[in-house]
Amino acid sequence: MTTHTPTSNNLQAANANLPAAGNNLPAADHNVDTAQSSNETPDTDIASITVWRTHFSTNATLGALYINGKFFCHTLEPRTRPKGAPKIPGKTAIPEGKYRLSLNVASPRFSDYKHHPWARPWSGKMPFLCNVPGFNGVLIHVGNTPNDTAGCILVGQATAPDFIVNSIPTFRRLMLRLQRHPRHIPLYICVRNHPKSRLCPIGLGE
């Protein structure tokens, strides 16, 4: 699978100009969460899915998800570890890498439709990242803050440090896009720290 480095136009759309972490996050882009974004490719085949991590704080990692090299939505993960730093269970993001993406794994947590009614249309099935080193059950799902993820990738629209909004409509749009991909062709996702980004140090004693 080809990994696309964001172009200058796409970086502007995703606000990857990389100011100091936690400051001057992208203004709300109201087109991001419409049913048919102008940035969404009309093709059914997905050649690449990439999460570029662009903003790092001591609490969270903000990024941008690209499909076939085009900006699709913002992402939020737990804070990212500097290379060699130990994992803090439930508090740190997954390692950079390329992972098989499955759409056939039902999450027990999100199968509780009383508390997660947005998951009912998908029968509790979330995009599942396979074989992530040191992590189990890594999903792409709905949420707003670092408290909503223990290592998973949240999707939405970034409007403030450590916070995303419009997560439910963004997730719906993502699922509809992924489901259009031919089932017999494997899906993969690449998670990368943007080369211009800077990691915030993590206090190992916390």
Put a short name on every predicted segment.
Residues 2-6, 11, 33-187, 193-198:
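Cell wall/extracellular polymer interaction/catalysis modules
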Residues 10-28, 32:
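Long, intrinsically disordered low-complexity tandem-repeat segments
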Residues 197-206:
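C-terminal helix/juxtamembrane-tail motif
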